Amino acid sequence: MRAALWFLALFGVASAVALFAGDNQGTVTVFWPPWRVDLSLNLTLLLVLMAFGLLHVALRALSALFSLPRQARQWRLQQKERSLHAALLDALAQLLAGRFSRARKAAQAALAQERALAGLDARLPQAQQIRVLSHLLAAESSQALQDRAARDAHLQQALNESAERGVLVSPETREGVQLRAARWALDDRDAPAALARLEELPQGAQRRTLALRLRLKAARQDRRTREALETARLLAKHRAFSDAAAQSLVRGLATELLSGAHDPTQLLRAWDELESTEREMPEVAIHAAQRMVALRGDLALARAWLLPVWERMVEQPRSLNDSLRVKLVRALEAGLDSVDADWLARIESAQRDDPRDANLQYLAGMACVKRQLWGKAQQLLTHAGLALQDPLLHRRTWQALAQLAEARDDADQASAAWKRAAQLEAP
């Protein structure tokens, strides 16, 4: 279509020229004493056009001639710029391939090319960012080579370059350097330095998933359990882990926080710092109760912490595994001396509803021992002793049966029970 239009235009121009020049009788007379030259108007116009064309070509030729030095300089700068980018890409490729010495050399070559360009007064739009990335790649390679002196030198230069904020430099460049510095501090087992690097980040950058992961590792490494727990909660909200992994991580940190309490007041303060979902975790509640028992605190409060776990076990017997059921029984057994009537009713009701559960038989039997219900205690503990799997509970069962036999002055049964208890290894 375009060619057809060009042909039509060409035909139109040819027709116009033919109409204008075909019957044109005009002449142009040039007086140059003593000469006189008569030229037709058509020839005059043709000569003018030819002169204009020659002048235009001559000017273009002169312009091209005088621009040769500038074009040669631009060509040299382009070659150096290409070499710079090639060296930077080579450094990244060598780093990813695990060739750290070559990666560092390539990064240093990129820095040398950038300095050469700067010496030629070449202004690259991304010069500052290229310098920062080159230093960062060199520092990363030095870290892999265990050359901490070179790593720190390149890191400091990268920080200095990124601190000079220009219009064309993005803040993410400096944030990336700070995150890598925090990671290297973690690799050096220097958690305070890693946390200090993370604190230098802007507020928005501190809440990114990568920064939170680094903060979590640094806090755990530095034994800052509260900070680690808060960070783990944020990561769970950001879905940085799977639900199971997040729950396991939070559960472990909550348990560690409770373990750090050295008196009942500290334990209660740590318990209050936990969220409701964390308090409902069986492992956390049982561990809190065990710590309260170990610290000789309020056993009624410990039983109150265990109540949701107990109700869950009664309503859904399979919701707790055998290990948690044993821990729950141990925690409740430790407070049987001060247990109230409500808890005794709960224990008795749960044992009646599930008469084959050896753990419940043991707990109910020990409760009967504390209440001096010898006959019922003898019956429950005898059945429990035949089915218990936990070595400690099994051993305590036979010890209790031996004490009951001694109370009845039955020396033979007491001796047999003590013998069975001695045969069981303490955990």
Task: Label every PLM stretch briefly.
Residues 97, 145-146, 188, 222, ...:
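Structural motif corresponding to the intra-repeat A-B loop/turn of tetratricopeptide repeats
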Residues 44-75:
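Transmembrane alpha-helices and immediately adjacent membrane-cytoplasm interface residues
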Residues 108, 149-161, 190-202, 225-238, ...:
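Alpha-helical repeat scaffolds
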Residues 146, 174-183, 317-390:
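Alpha-helical adaptor scaffolds
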Residues 74-182, 188-193:
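Membrane-proximal, non-transmembrane interface segments of integral membrane proteins
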Residues 94, 135, 142-143, 185, ...:
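Residue at a conserved register position within TPR or TPR-like alpha-solenoid repeats
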Residues 83, 124, 131, 174, ...:
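Residues that mark the junctions of alpha-helical repeat units in TPR/alpha-solenoid scaffolds
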Residues 90, 131, 138, 181, ...:
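Structural register within alpha-helical repeat arrays
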